[in-house]
Amino acid sequence: MNIELRDPNIIMKLSRLGSFHQSRLSFLRSFLSEFKDWQYNRDLFDLDQEGYGTAVYSFKKKDRVYSLICYANKINDDERSDRVIATKWDAAFTLHDGVPLKEDIDRLRNEVPKQEVGRLSYKELTLSRANKSVRVFDHVVESLSNGNQPDLELLEKVGYLYRTTAVYGSGKFGLADRFRIKNREEINGPFRLEMMLVYLVRQFTFDQVNHVAKNKNPNSAVKLDPKICRNLGIGNSTGLGMAPFIVNHPTLLNNWILSREIALKKIREIKIVKTQDRDLFKDCLKSSLKNITSWNTESEYQLKKIKLLLKDIKKFISFLENKFDFQKDYPFNEIYLWLEKETCEECIEYVVSIMMEPFGDIVQPLVGQMSSEEEKYFNIPTERNVGDLKKILENKYSDILKINFNIEESNQKFWFISKNKEEPRLANRFEENGADLEQPLAIARDIKKLYERLLPLKDDLKINQFLIDNSDVRHVVRRAFIIEKFPYSEIQDNTIGENLVPIDMLRLKLSFFGALKFDPRSDKWLRICMFQGAPLPNELKDYDEQWVYKTYS
């Protein structure tokens, strides 16, 4: 049986992309798989009694070493903020290429806590900062110092001791440019160094809380139980800064989505499913119910999605247990077709992720195909003609061409860059000033504009001639020729319409990171948790690959 890849016109709608969940393809999971054979060390731990100071953690294999340098800082409660305008954080971090010398640690002590204002060197690969969940951190310290383990209900509700507010890489603020390291096999997957930083920061939070508790009451203090550590991750607060990325990197976006679609296609094409694969799928599905029921949010938008997801998952489990025969040919194709007919988008994509769990042999080769040499596809084939371009637009953007951009509802929003932090923002063009500073993120509108310009022209007119008088649409001409080869490179939705839900764009990217517990705080920012349930560094050599579905076992 040959299953077609899913239609980009359906999959690339924001409501569907905003229903994606982590999977075996997610970057934090592929990072753990890649680095499980590396030697982990805590090389320096120089904190005072209150937990302030410097620590260094490393992964080493043969002659290659990556070192996380941590600077824990004392700040006032009124200085602690997750917003981008913050200037102080509880801790700041950089991932250093190699073994840092004392001079490096001293140099970076003056720069890393400044974050965007500081300056790094080519020796540094990533940069981040994080704030404590003060309520949780203080509770854990108090409990441990008195010889007790902390309240599991509180820890389950929050899920972390610290949350990061930004992770930077690839040449920002003096960090090493990607060309310096891109040929290293171990970091071939997207965002692998960023995942390493977050993973090691997680371990630092456990070590710090143990250290503070021990110094508070040396005679009675106990360490945080490893099982509890495992069930804690790192939180993250993410705003609109992440949204333009998926618009500005079309071939990379395509490769992420395409890997997922190929995995699903191949799984649906399996004629006979082995008993152990069937059982693993069902076990992960049932175990994941705990993840859904422990998903805390105050967002009405997300609560509705969670409620419907839980209802549909239970309906699906009942179908599997009572009505479905896994012995029939192509069982996962039957399952997928049933899901499309009977359940919501959130449930469909949730189960698609779980379908991948038994099939590491299918998924693992795809992990290596998720990066992109984007500059290869930047040049516009100017020898092509207008007729070619029209056909591409009609075939690849059919739904977008139906949008009427002459009405306010379709044109309501505009994207701009804030002056104070150089971060993306979204505004109402009919109520706020600044539309003259609009960023080129309204791809649907510009595609429609391009199409209307092409309509009266002769098909044999060359693209180079067209661009002489139409340079303002050059960016979407390029995108059209990209989507011709990369079908999942474009969001098939209006990113400036009144119905835009920006967190759908954030959630798409975060699902590929491997995030859990999406908790929208508005339609423009949300909190998530990463590495919750993941093995600890000293457990990496032999860990359960399905850890993400067994967080609270």
Task: State each model region's role.
Residues 109-153, 157-165, 169, 176:
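Charged, structured surface patches that assemble and position nucleic-acid processing machinery
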Residues 2-19, 50-52, 65, 72, ...:
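Long, solvent-exposed non-transmembrane regions
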Residues 149-196, 202-203, 207-330, 334-341, ...:
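Acidic, proline/glycine-rich low-complexity IDRs
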Residues 62-125, 203-245, 255-256, 283, ...:
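Intrinsically disordered, low-complexity regulatory segments enriched in Ser/Thr/Pro
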Residues 336, 376, 399, 411-413, ...:
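Alpha-helix boundary/capping motif
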Residues 347, 418, 446, 453, ...:
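Long C-terminal interaction/binding lobes of large macromolecular proteins
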Residues 33-87, 346, 388-393, 398-407, ...:
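Amphipathic, interaction-prone secondary-structure segments
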Residues 15-42:
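Amphipathic alpha-helical segments
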